[in-house]
Amino acid sequence: LVCDAAGFHNTYMQFVQCAVLGLALAVYAVTLPECPVNRGGEKKSLVEALGLRAFTLFRQKKMALFFIFSMLLGVSLQITNGFANPFITSFRGIPEYASTFGANHANALISLSQVSETLCILLIPFCLKRFGIKNVMLMAMFAWVLRFGLFGLGNPGGGVWMFILSMIVYGVAFDFFNISGSLFVNNETDVAIRSSAQGLFMIMTNGVGATVGTLGAQAVVNRFVNSQSSVSAMTAGWSTSWLVFAGYALCVAIVFALVFKYKHDPEAIGNVGH
């Protein structure tokens, strides 16, 4: 919001702003209480020291499926981060939408996603207890379908409500899978490799999945948007691209619902240690 209000979104000052905020957070981090790592008394091998024992979890069908779907869903994570702004801003080239708030203040509109992300964290304990980890992860997957689909159908004029709704469901899409997935790993792994398993979860989602998703999304946008010569064709291409992303997320959600088996235990959720 500050970046948008100050007009930094099209200048190098946005990076200066981020640098200042980063330094402020670094100073704040120094003031946090000390949390020493439990290293244990035994000598560890190089494999254990590097956390590679977590890869043995792929021998378990349930964990292997979970990590594979984590990667598949991770494909969706960075798509809107990279393309939401240029998509919404592109409407400035269409006279009908050139003067709309959304087309001229895309960052302010997109910032609603972060507000939703913050608030949706508060819903996770209730939803996990009530519906279970699998259903919460399914909610996240279908939320990604809505996130992309609403982008594909909306516009910053009369359809701006679809953009706003897309920003709202982002909180469910992002939080519900990342938090519930982390709790799943916590519940299903031995304490000796739990930290490494959490790292593997992050690698599969924000590492492999996000990288594949960014490259794949760029290919889709190049095919349907950047290859067009007219503004109207590019706008139609953006809509097609978002619907392609929505279709992908829908396929992942359906297959996950069919092949991933997990029995909900409310007590296990309630007794998760931190």
Model segments located where?
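Helix-to-loop junctions at the C-terminal end of transmembrane segments
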Residues: C3, L119-I133, V221
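Short amphipathic helix-loop junctions that connect adjacent transmembrane helices
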Residues: D4, G82-A106
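A membrane-interface helix-boundary motif in multi-pass transporters
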Residues: D4-V20, A219-A249
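Multi-pass alpha-helical transporter architecture, strongest
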Residues: A24-P33, W238-H274
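Juxtamembrane intracellular "pre-TM" segments in multi-pass secondary transporters
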Residues: E34-F66, G93-P95
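Pair of pore-lining "gating" transmembrane helices in MFS-fold secondary transporters
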Residues: R59-T80, I168
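C-terminal ends and interior cores of transmembrane alpha-helices
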Residues: F142-P156
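Intracellular juxtamembrane helix-capping segments at the cytosolic ends
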Residues: F176-D190
